[in-house]
């Protein structure tokens, strides 16, 4: 099904090199009213994250109009201002439209208290706006922790070592529309230094843990009263993302552990074994079809 994307977005050419011809999927002006999705991209390297989400949303069975949101109170240090001005919009600009779905990405600030993040106040305003005006929101990784803290006062805790790898995860509520077509176990990429804990979430009546891993802990939490999902991992990750992180960290110090269940035979020289892509596509398409696309 077609996508509507900003003209000239670099992700279009990147995906073309992966034999995903986004140009063939681009919507025409006379197409019917699309589902409008806004991605609040908090990651430093914007184009990489844009590509990850467009890659996965390109499988949508429904027409999607995808736009990107930026913060007013924080300037990106790793993405040119020209890129941000051309392809990103503020909350004030996007709030004039009817938004069906929102995705809030992770951010490399998990070592800080939420209140110490320089854009925390603005982020809270966006969270509140999304809750009142958007049909469904996906909060990813740090954003999941931030959303749980903002709405429900759920704390995050430092981990003794980085949760890093592809972890077997169990859908505890397989009847949830998000899990249509899922197996009894699915793999979820994780890359984080902090966690939220089951006991804190279970104290909140409005929250329900719908997926969990024996090794990596809480995986997906949903709001019972709203179409909000808090995902602690990164199903949107490209095949080489954890490899890039591993080699980046290895260049800084020697005590970096190999990401678990990621490389063939646990050997970085043999490359990653991609096991999560089909469930990642399924989860996002279920979100589009059954959560956004249904009244």
Regions found by a protein language model. Give the residues of each.
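Short, glycine/acidic-enriched capping/hinge loops at junctions between secondary-structure elements
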Residues: 49-52, 78-81, 114-115
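Cysteine-nucleophile active-site neighborhood
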Residues: 104-173
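N-terminal beta-loop-helix "entrance" segment that forms/cooperates
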Residues: 72-85
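Short, Asp-centered acidic motifs that coordinate Mg2+ and/or phosphate
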Residues: 101
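Amide-donor transfer/coupling interface in amidating biosynthetic enzymes
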Residues: 1-73, 89-94, 98, 125, ...
């Amino acid at each position: 099904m077609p996508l509507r994307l900003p003209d000239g977005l670099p992700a279009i050419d990147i995906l073309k090199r992966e034999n995903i011809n986004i140009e063939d999927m681009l919507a025409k002006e006379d197409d019917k009213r699309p589902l409008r999705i806004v991605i609040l991209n908090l990651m430093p390297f914007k184009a990489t994250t844009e590509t990850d989400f467009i890659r996965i949303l390109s499988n949508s069975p429904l027409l999607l109009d995808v736009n990107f949101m930026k913060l007013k109170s924080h300037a990106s240090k790793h993405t040119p201002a020209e890129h941000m001005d051309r392809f990103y919009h503020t909350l004030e600009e996007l709030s004039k439209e009817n938004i069906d779905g929102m995705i809030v990405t992770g951010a490399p600030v998990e070592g800080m208290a939420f209140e110490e993040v320089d854009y925390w106040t603005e982020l809270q305003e966006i969270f509140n706006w999304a809750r009142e005006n958007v049909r469904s929101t996906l909060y990813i990784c740090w954003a999941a922790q931030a959303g749980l803290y903002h709405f429900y006062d759920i704390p995050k805790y430092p981990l003794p070592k980085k949760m890093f790898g592809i972890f077997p995860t169990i859908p505890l509520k397989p009847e949830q529309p998000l899990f249509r077509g899922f197996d009894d176990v699915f793999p979820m990429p994780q890359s984080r230094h902090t966690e939220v804990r089951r006991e804190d979430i279970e104290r909140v009546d409005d929250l329900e843990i719908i997926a969990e891993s024996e090794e990596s802990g809480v995986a997906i939490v949903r709001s019972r009263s709203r179409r909000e999902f808090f995902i602690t991992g990164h199903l949107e990750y490209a095949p080489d993302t954890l490899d890039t992180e591993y080699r980046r960290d290895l260049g800084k110090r020697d005590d970096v552990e190999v990401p678990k269940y990621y490389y063939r035979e646990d050997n970085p020289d043999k490359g990653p074994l991609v096991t999560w892509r089909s469930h990642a596509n399924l989860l996002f398409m279920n979100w589009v079809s059954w959560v956004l696309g249904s009244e």
